[in-house]
């Protein structure tokens, strides 16, 4: 099974992906996590350091695939999760989609691509071009990480459009949304009511999730010295169980941008029950300028 994890930049995709990967490994799966981001920090919390990228390795070998061994590019992470970082082209040059393609090509050359029960692609930010939608070409399921805010749900909506487009030619389905570090879910609920899709899990605001990223450890590793964090791991184990159940998934139909703006801004301007999230129109419009 191949899973592509998408979501707005900075939403916590890599931290979530690493913990899901360990949870899947705890369920007896052989897991490979592939970081698809030029920052090459997707697997940091699994390995504790920035591993060499596929592109760096290919360049050092002058693109002679026959000179590369699996141990040159596949690094063992916490919990037995294997880790690969695709890397990326120089800033302002090249295509990230090409890098993903080269990564898959090399793993196939090494007879490694089909050795895993689960391959998880952790993909940077929003889908802004066909290149960064490339992991969807290989995925069975897409999981979207979001929170209860405008920007993240707008990004999620754009990603659903990419899933729908890729599903025309690939057996791809959306497994659902994962809400990360959010104290409310009213906007999430409003969005999935208008654009029906499963909500796999919504994680509350837990400071240790953020701290784990800084420490370079998964929650599962931290629980060894802090048993009180075991309840947090159960969230990720629950997500893993839902993925392993091979859900039917859906091909979503995105909401037009203006309709989504109206939908979410209406909830902000007229919050259910009053108070809480009420903002003036100027604040909302300023929020949308950041999209």
Swiss-Prot record:
Pathway where it operates: Porphyrin-containing compound metabolism; chlorophyll biosynthesis (light-independent)
Lineage summary: Eukaryota, Viridiplantae, Streptophyta, Embryophyta, Tracheophyta
Enzyme Commission no: 1.3.7.7
Cofactor binding annotation: Binds 1 [4Fe-4S] cluster per dimer.
GO BP of this protein: light-independent chlorophyll biosynthetic process; photosynthesis, dark reaction
Organism, as annotated: Pinus contorta (Shore pine)
UniProt: [4Fe-4S] cluster binding residues: 95, 129
Positions with a binding annotation for ATP: 10-15, 39, 180-181
Residues annotated as signal peptide: none
Protein name per Swiss-Prot or TrEMBL: Light-independent protochlorophyllide reductase iron-sulfur ATP-binding protein
Top-level class of the enzyme under EC nomenclature: oxidoreductase
